[in-house]
């Protein structure tokens, strides 16, 4: 992802040399450093993406976005590596509000990296978006179990995915969490 975000065909690394990486991935290549040491390095190819959608805590309408949790998860690299880039966010705010909560270090996404923004509360469900909400482990377990069986998947899809709107999905998830059906 980093190579693609820099628009490079590959990045050299020492990681993997002296291991079975080259044996297990025979399509990988090595390159020699053009400098005096002429060190042999592994050339890891860029992972170019057609589309990236990342979810952030807050964003403005221009595409400047902020994460408030403890880990940034490579979201900037996904956007940098993609041809089309979108941010969904818990809350759409005026630009000046982005500096009112969290340090400037939390503003890792800027408008030049983004093609569009959409406000989508709870848009990272079933994963987390701290401090707004944590992982929904029970829902993730239901999802993983359903994915193992075609009939179970069809039922899961009908309950959660084949709905008319995001609002219906959120109601179904809330009903499930409350122990009821939608």
Language model segments and positions:
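Conserved alpha/beta enzyme-core scaffold
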Residues: 1-182
């Amino acid at each position: 992802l980093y190579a693609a975000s820099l628009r490079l065909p590959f990045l050299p690394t020492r990681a993997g040399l002296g291991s079975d990486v080259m044996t297990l991935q025979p399509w990988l290549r090595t390159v020699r450093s053009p400098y005096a040491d002429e060190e042999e390095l592994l050339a890891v190819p860029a992972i170019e993406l057609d589309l990236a959608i990342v979810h952030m805590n807050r964003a403005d309408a221009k595409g400047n976005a902020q994460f408030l949790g403890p880990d940034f998860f490579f979201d900037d690299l996904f956007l940098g590596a993609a041809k089309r880039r979108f941010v969904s966010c818990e809350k759409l705010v005026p630009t000046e509000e982005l500096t009112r909560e969290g340090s400037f270090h939390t503003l890792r996404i800027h408008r030049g990296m983004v093609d569009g923004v959409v406000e989508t509360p709870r848009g990272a469900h079933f994963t987390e978006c701290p401090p707004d909400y944590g992982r929904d482990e029970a829902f993730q377990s239901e999802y993983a179990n359903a994915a193992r069986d075609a009939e179970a998947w069809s039922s899961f899809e009908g309950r959660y995915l084949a709905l008319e709107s995001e609002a219906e999905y959120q109601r179904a998830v809330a009903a499930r969490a409350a122990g009821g059906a939608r």
